[in-house]
Amino acid sequence: MEGWRISLLNEKEKTIFVDADACPVKEEIMLIASQVSVRVIFVASFEHYQLSRSKDENWVYVDPHKEAADLYIANHVRSGDVVVTQDIGLASLLLNRNIAVLSERGRSYTEDTIDFALMSRHMSGKMRRSGIHSKGPKKLNKEDRNRFVTLLKKILSNDEGISNQNIE
């Protein structure tokens, strides 16, 4: 049926999209989202497919190409949704579309911070190509997790008009 597209998403339902291949805060996302009845869609490569996924979780599997998960998210996210990603390039694509974008370390990507993040990424890539390698990011710690939980609760409570204290 040319011209017809079936959408699995309710047009008015807020959704949290998670770039899930390496996301360490999936449990926190599910817990918070269930408390405020917000839909979560985890997007991952087929390389990370698991039969044991909970039936309460919504998983979308994409080809194992480098940007496939990012492209899926960029094509399906709507104004007012929330995206959790560590991909600065994806974050920069989404910011001007009224989408809240945050990292799994609890950092909010904004129009004010994205240029610096993109420049830092560019400079790090340039250094790697010239043979200078730096350490990767530190392992996610409890402080990072707490910062993430606090930020996600704040975003959802502001959007839904509910008290942040009502989200445990």
Curated annotation (Swiss-Prot):
InterPro entries in the record: UPF0178 (IPR003791)
Family annotation (Pfam families): DUF188
Family annotation (CDD domains): PIN_YqxD-like
Family, similarity comment: Belongs to the UPF0178 family.
HAMAP family noted in UniProt: UPF0178
Protein name per Swiss-Prot or TrEMBL: UPF0178 protein RBAM_023530
Originating organism: Bacillus velezensis (strain DSM 23117 / BGSC 10A6 / LMG 26770 / FZB42)
